[in-house]
């Protein structure tokens, strides 16, 4: 099999070292039995991300074909659910896919965020699990479910309110930091967008791609009980994480 590993990045300098270390280890594992290509797309960073990615991509390129696009589009760095934000992210994901080799070469396309912590061997389980779209689940530094907007159990939901999964769960949509997609829908024209084709409303880009897959007959979407963690970002999360580390030492 051949895998395309994709990462989009913007102002993630603080997370690049762990991103590289994990991705490098995962690539080594995959290369034992498969072909791998890596695609990285960055735009409009102002914190040193551009140079950091250049350094790490040069190292990854010694393992397999690796493409980096670093550009300045002049887009604002938005937060929340704004239509411009999800459109920017969707465009970045599409560019990341399209700058790689011909899509016809790949069996699976895997998106891996820069700001997640995971065990490479567990990521392998996600990547190899049979399904049209497969993910684990994300938690924040306090152990709470993280990717609640993108993850939905039914078409009527707009937010995940089902707690932490303890078993494989069929879902309407998912992403959760590491998400493996069958390449066939992309070969047939599926792309990310900020507009949900079923509701014609602004929606999470990674929810939208699940809707697009479903619309063309790829509806096997699952979330596995594999924890992908986000490091602490707020003061409250940092204090909680520090307290937990102290308790583990006792």
In which residue ranges do the predicted regions lie?
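Acidic helix N-cap motif at the loop->helix transition within catalytic regions
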Residues: 15, 47-56
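Short beta-strand/loop segment that forms part of the nucleotide-sugar
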Residues: 34-44, 69-71
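C-terminal catalytic/acceptor-binding lobe
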Residues: 166-250
């Amino acid at each position: 099999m051949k895998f395309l590993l994709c990462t989009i990045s913007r102002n993630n300098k603080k997370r690049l070292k762990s991103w590289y270390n994990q991705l490098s280890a995962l690539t080594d594992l995959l290369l034992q039995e498969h072909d791998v290509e890596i695609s990285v797309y960055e735009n409009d960073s102002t914190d040193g991300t551009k140079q950091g990615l250049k350094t790490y991509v040069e190292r990854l390129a010694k393992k397999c074909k690796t493409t980096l696009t670093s550009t300045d589009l002049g887009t604002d760095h938005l937060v929340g659910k704004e239509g411009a934000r999800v459109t920017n992210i969707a465009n970045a994901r599409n560019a990341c896919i399209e700058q790689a080799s011909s899509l016809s070469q790949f069996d699976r396309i895997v998106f891996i965020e820069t700001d997640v912590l995971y065990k490479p061997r567990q990521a392998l389980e996600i990547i190899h699990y049979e399904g049209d779209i497969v993910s684990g689940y994300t938690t924040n530094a306090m152990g709470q479910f993280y990717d609640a907007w993108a993850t939905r159990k039914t078409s009527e939901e707009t937010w995940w309110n089902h707690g932490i999964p303890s078993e494989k769960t069929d879902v309407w949509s998912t992403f959760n930091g590491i998400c493996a997609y069958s390449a066939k829908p992309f070969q047939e024209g599926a792309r990310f967008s900020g507009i949900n084709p079923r509701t014609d409303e602004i929606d999470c880009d990674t929810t939208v791609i699940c809707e697009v897959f479903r619309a063309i007959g790829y509806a096997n979407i699952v979330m596995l009980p594999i924890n992908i963690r986000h490091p602490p970002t707020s003061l409250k999360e940092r204090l909680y994480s520090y307290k937990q580390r102290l308790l583990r030492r006792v």
